[in-house]
Regions:
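C-terminal portion of ABC ATPase nucleotide-binding domains
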Residues: 4, 32, 40, 47, ...
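Conserved catalytic loops of ABC-family nucleotide-binding domains
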Residues: 51-60
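Hydrophobic anchor residue at the start of the ABC signature
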Residues: 17, 61
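Active-site beta3 strand of CheY-like receiver
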Residues: 29
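ABC ATPase nucleotide-binding domain helices that frame the ATP-binding cleft
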Residues: 15-16, 22
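Conserved ABC ATPase nucleotide-binding domain "signature" region
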Residues: 2-5, 11-14, 40-43
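A short, proline-enriched helix->beta-strand linker immediately N-terminal to the Walker B motif
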Residues: 22-26, 55
């Protein structure tokens, strides 16, 4: 990129995420930070994150199930209210809202 001005949205997101890992905070907050990443990059990042942030608190705000399906706890919100809480597998069993979201993104069996 020319002076850093010619980067794509996905490249910009990867740079911001890399800066956060270098800073090594006790709490990581990702607010829809993976939306511009392709599926392969997102999967690689999620795998690396699980190792890097083992002893840290990680909060992920996401619309993509693939971004949060390995989380210890997922909060499902609808109309500004928490309507379900659990792991990916638990929510597939207990939350119609989560099942619908996962099915619409083809994440039911993944």
């Amino acid at each position: 990129a020319q002076g850093g001005t010619n980067v794509s949205g996905g490249q910009r997101q990867r740079l911001c995420i890399a800066r956060m890992f270098v800073a090594d905070p006790k709490v990581y907050v990702f607010d829809d930070s993976f939306s511009a990443l392709d599926a392969t990059t997102e999967a690689n990042l999620n795998a690396a994150m699980r190792e890097i942030v083992q002893d840290r608190t990680v909060i992920v705000v996401a619309q993509k199930v693939s971004s949060i399906k390995h989380a210890d706890q997922i909060l499902v919100m609808e109309a500004g209210r928490i309507v379900a809480r659990g792991t990916h597998d638990e929510l597939l069993q207990t939350s119609e809202t989560y099942r619908e979201i996962a099915a619409s993104q083809a994440e039911v069996d993944a």
